[in-house]
């Protein structure tokens, strides 16, 4: 198999990198040891920066139906802190999505860009 770019790992970063490379006209193969969709027990939180990246990638349409949060709440040692998102050039909200859905949505964007998948 010949390819210009081999991306190993079809999580959010790998799938996004593969999509951007394919959109730049490169022949891209995206390899992952698992079969998709697959779940991971970590990383469900989406910061405003993550929301902005999903928007830029064209993968944010499914996130708009999810609950939004306006910041983080940290509790411990007898106190609770509320930390609002900074805003500025980023969206003023965050969200959360199960990795089962997030990873699959970004991977589908990569496949739509012409990426060749290799799974399992």
Enumerate the predicted regions with their spans.
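Conserved N-terminal helical subregion
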Residues: 1, 52, 68, 74-120
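Short phosphate-binding/catalytic loops that engage adenosine nucleotides
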Residues: 26, 59, 115
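N-terminal FAD cofactor-binding segment of flavoenzymes
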Residues: 39-77
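Small-residue (primarily alanine) positions within well-ordered alpha-helices
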Residues: 10-13, 17-22, 110
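Beta1/beta-strand and adjacent pyrophosphate-binding region of the FAD-binding site
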Residues: 1-13
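Glycine-rich FAD pyrophosphate-binding loop
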Residues: 6, 22-42
């Amino acid at each position: 198999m010949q390819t210009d770019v081999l991306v190993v790992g079809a999580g959010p970063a790998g799938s996004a990198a593969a999509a951007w490379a394919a959109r730049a006209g490169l022949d891209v193969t995206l390899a992952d040891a698992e079969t998709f969709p697959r779940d991971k027990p970590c990383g469900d939180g989406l910061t405003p920066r993550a929301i902005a990246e999903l928007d830029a990638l064209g993968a944010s349409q499914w996130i708009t139906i999810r609950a939004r949060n306006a910041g983080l709440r940290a509790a411990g040692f007898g106190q609770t802190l509320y930390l609002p998102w900074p805003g500025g050039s980023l969206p003023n909200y965050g969200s959360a999505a199960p990795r089962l859905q997030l990873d699959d949505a970004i991977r589908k964007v990569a496949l739509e860009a012409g990426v060749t998948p290799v799974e399992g």
